[in-house]
Amino acid sequence: DMELGIETKIEGEIAERGIIALDAKIFSEIVRKLPDNDITIETDDNYTSTITCEKSKFNIAGKSGDDFSYLPVIIKEKSISLSQFTLKETINQTIFCTSPNDNNKMMTGELFEVKDNVLKVVGLDGHRIAIRNINLSGNADDVKVVVPGKTLNEISKILSSDAESVVNIYFTNNHILFEFDNTMVVSRLIEGEYF
C-alpha cells in the first residue's frame, strides 16, 4: 500500500514461470486456514488463480503482476541486529501506548532511538507511555526514527518467538527495513520530531 510492503521468498516446484498480483488479505486468509501440506497454485490467462491443498480448492481473481509496485531498494548502511523474540516482546510491551486515530500522526507510531549501543523503543498516546531499552552488541550508529504502529503490529504477527532467530533492522531517512528468515518488511517512517 506504499506505506508498508512485505516480501517473502519460499521454495517450491515451479512448472512454469509467471507473475500475478492477488489480493493479499484474501490470499493470506485462505493460506492460513489450509492444512499443513503441499499447496498448488495454478493461474490461467484471465489471471484467475486456483489454490488447491488436499480436498480444499479456492479460486481468486487476480490481475497482471507487471504493474505491481515492488519494494523500494534500501541502502543497508545504518543497522542493528537483535533476536526476533526480543523485538516481538518489545513491540507487544509498548504498542498498546500508541494512538489508534490519526489526529496526531506522531502518536500512531513508536520512537526507535539507537544511542550508545542501546535501542530505546517508546510508545506514547498522550495519556500513557511505554519505554523499553535493549542493549545491542557491536557498534551501532545513532538513529532516531518514528515507525508506524501499523507496521509494528504486522511485524509482531510474523516474527518468531525463537530467541536464536535474528532480525536485522536497517534505517534510512525515509524507510525502515526489517529482514529475517526469508522475509523483508519495508515501511515508510513517520516524518517529524517525536515528543
Which residues does each predicted region cover?
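Structural preference for solvent-exposed beta-strand-turn elements
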Residues: 1-195
